[in-house]
Amino acid sequence: MIHPVRVAHRGASGSGLAPENTLAAFERAIQLGVDAVEIDVRATRDGVVVVMHDPTIDRTTNQEGPVDERTFSQLREADAGGWFGPGFAGERIPTLQEVFDLVRHRAVAVVEIKADWLAERVLKVAHDVDVVDQIVIQSFSPETVRRINAVDPSVPTAFLLGNLPTSPARMRARRVAREVLAVGANILNVWHAALTPPFFEEMRKRGVSVWTWTVDEEAVMRDVIQMGVHGVITNHPDRLNRVLEELENEGAILVPMGRRQRLKPSRWHRRRQIRKVSRRRRPG
C-alpha cells in the first residue's frame, strides 16, 4: 500500500481550522505537514488572478457580487475570514502570486482553473514567482488541460471527474483512460463517491495515477488509501494525518515521501503511456 499525496482542499478549510482559500488556511495546511494545497483561481475585472472558488464573493466574504465584475482593489475591501470565526476577521482574498509566495519551497500548489483562458496567466505567475516546478494544474475542462500541455508540457496536469459512466468497471476504465490519454493529463482526479475498487484496479492496470476528492470522513479516507489511490484531497488534513499514522502503526502503509520528493510533483505520477489491457485473464 502506497503513501498517498496529501492535498489540503482550499487549504486546511475544515471546521475548526481556517476559512477556505485564505493565506491563513494555506499556512495552517503547511503547518499540518501536507504535501500540497489545492486552490481555485479566477480573475478580477482588471485582470488580477485571485484565489476564490465561487463565481461570486457572497458565500465567503462580508460583501456580494461577481468576482469578474469587481476590480482587485474593490475585492480587497471584502473580509474573507470573519464569516468563519472572529479570530480570522480581516483576512483578505489573496492573489495567486501571494499564495505562490507563501508555498514556495514549502508545499506544492494544485491549481484548479475555472476558465480556459486563465491557463496562460496562471503559468506566467508561476514563472514570475519561480514555482513552475512546484505546481500541478487541474480542471474539469478537457480544453484547459490540453491548453496547459500545449503551452508548457513540463507542468503536470490533472483531469477532474465527478460522476463516472454507468457501465461495467472495465468498460468505464477503458473509456476514461482514452479520455485521459486524449487530453494529455498525468493524473485522474475522481470524486470519491464515484470511485470503486474494480474501477481503480482497471485504471491501475492501465498505468493511470488516480487521486480522489474531497474526502473528509476518516472511514472513507481509510478505504481509499487501502484501495491504493495515489493522492487524497481533503478539507481535513488533520484527520488524514491521523488515519495515515494509524495505518503506518499497523504496518499497512509505506513510509511518507521524503521532503525532496514531496516538493517535486513531476515525481507523483506515472510518466509512461497509458496501456491497453488484454481482455484475456493473465495467468497467476
Label the predicted regions.
Residues 1-284:
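Phosphate-group recognition and catalysis centered on beta-loop-alpha active-site segments
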